Amino acid sequence: MVEVLRSSTFLLLRNWEFTLAWIVFFTIPLVITPLPYVGFLAFFFILLFFNSTTQYFVKVLSKNEKSLEIKEIFKIKKPVFSFSLGESVYLFFTALLYYLFTKFYAVLFFWWWFYKPFLEKELYYARTFEDGFKALLILLLRPNWKYIKLGLRWSFIGLVLLTIAVLLVLSIAGVLLASFVVLLLSVVLAHFTAETILRIKTLA
């Protein structure tokens, strides 16, 4: 476990963008306001819920189960936890940096539309805490561009759902229901992400 964290840290620090984001995150916000840390925690828990839901739907769809046990979603497995932790750190820091360069939306578009379903595919095989980190790193180091076409259907549906969610959040009712909308959106997107994963032939 220590070796995985050490190698992962050295890998990320060699990326100047990540290093700069790390410096910005731990200096400026600490002096001005702790809100970015609160945002990071919220980001982590949203990803944790999403990843757990996705993995559950993959299991249900692959086994053609007729009934759903929603409580299983909240039984967070070790690889899902470590995967979500690594993902939230990497994505939050990267998004923070790109936000400074007005590229925030481009980062989210690339990550959620094309990368996310296939990182989830790798997570499907994970069984230990250490495997969760490996699942995150494998496609960051070796992206497979042929999978992009498989994510187009998921991307279109996700775009529609996100648009609806934004409109709700911008409305008066949306402000009151923002948390509910985020959870509902996570469940729906997780279902379609699971369908995308099952379309990938390498998932036996």
UniProtKB/Swiss-Prot annotation:
It is found in: Cell membrane. GO terms for cellular component: plasma membrane. The chain crosses the membrane at residues 21-50, 92-114, 150-172, 176-198. It comes from the Bacteria. Keywords: Cell membrane, Membrane, Transmembrane, Transmembrane helix. It is a multi-pass membrane protein. This is Uncharacterized protein aq_577. Its main location: membrane.
